[in-house]
Curated annotation (Swiss-Prot):
Glycosylation sites: N180, N293, N364, N388
Role according to the record: Secreted aspartic endopeptidase that allows assimilation of proteinaceous substrates. The scissile peptide bond is attacked by a nucleophilic water molecule activated by two aspartic residues in the active site. Shows a broad primary substrate specificity. Favors hydrophobic residues at the P1 and P1' positions.
Propeptide positions: 37-107
Active-site residues, record numbering mapped to chain: D139, D327
Gene Ontology CC: extracellular region
Gene Ontology biological-process annotations: proteolysis
Domain of life: Eukaryota
Name of the protein in question: Aspartic protease PEP3
Localisation per UniProt entry: Secreted
Main location group: secreted
Pfam families from the UniProt entry: Asp
Family under the similarity heading: Belongs to the peptidase A1 family.
Organism: Coccidioides posadasii (strain C735) (Valley fever fungus)
Signal peptide limits: 1-36
Gene coding for it: PEP3
Amino acid sequence: MQNRPRVFDSAMNLSPNMHFLSLMPGLLLLSLQVHTSPTPLKKTIRSVRIERIRQPNYVPDGPGALKKAYAKFGIIPSGISFDSFEDFTPFSSDNVRNTVSKAMQANETGIVTNTPTNNDVEYLSPVTIGGQKFVMNLDTGSSDTWVFNTQLSEDAKRGHSIFDPAKSKAFSDLEDATFNITYGDASFAFGRVGIDTVDIGGATVQKQAVGLPTDVSGSFILDQASDGLIGLGFDELNTVEPQQQKSFFTNLAANLDEPVLAAQLKKGAPGSYEFGSIDETKFKGDLVTIPVNNSRGFWEVKSTMFKVGKDEQLHRITKGVGSAIADTGTTLMLVNEEIVNSYYDQVDNARSVYAAGGFIFPCNATLPDLYVSLGDTHLARIPGDLMNFSKVGLSTETGEELCFGGVQSNSGSGLQVFGDVLFKAIFVVFDLRGPSLHVAGHA
């Protein structure tokens, strides 16, 4: 019997044996070698856990989530084969999100809330800047910290909590410094930069560079659930000029016993971020270590293989990029077209529809699991029930509801993005040492 690579099982546990995947010379067969468990990570005392709570008043918007992901990484939809599909009426959607409660008082243990909005589109966290409170997005796919502030127009500020530098005792201007985050569909935030104290539930950086935009795009203005963004990527992504600044995570690392961020983002259940330590009660089995390539500033890992459902064969990617970014700021999974086509080939009546912007299917369809490789040694299993992201429309012929998939095409770009759909399936630790990711099944 042929040995199999180590795979996260149906309960998202890790199997007891760990193996390497290696390609035998001249053959398209996978052989296996035994691999020892990674060195255990020291459990720490100096740490901060940021608890999240579920936001019940969300508006599912799959196409909106895909558009946002394309915009973030500058992906121009092209090369996707869309069906005409006249038998489809999309739901109308209100892109203005429900305003999230600003109940953000941390308790004496340093635990604060984190609120998912719009069908878990964003995981938001209470943040204090210069003693003023905000709700912001923790984003491992970028490296700038910026906040809505008094320099914006009255229309832009409406519905947001606003940072006032004059009310902060610690604020100072970063002389002649500017930041400019620009996304693919002209979404942007730019302006001057200051230095202030940033605190996330007790995780405190006293001299953090904070962008104070003088202008932001409409998409940020309409997103009234969020007052800004905390970038947790590598410093290479930081946009401050003339001198790049360190990200919040880089600065915070010096104050932690271990430079780690653990993300437990489970679907429909309380989850958390935790800086500085790894809670063994949050995962099952052993953590396994995946090397990270941070040359582009992302938490990027090798990902060259996949399989769908009960297919016994592992497929090696033959077209497209062989790596993926682990990004808490993106909702969906954006993968090579080879993967997305193979996946929806196994979903009855699934098709790529222009009016929806991506793959849709009958909401009652049975969805297969998707397996993607992380590094050379492991497969992560994303259960099929995580692939039904949101209702998107109706069949005008049958009246049946149609749903939008949680995995979509990266449109042939040079990036695969593993967003929150993956994080709902597995427990992930971002480790600045190495750097590396450590992964396991959710407890």
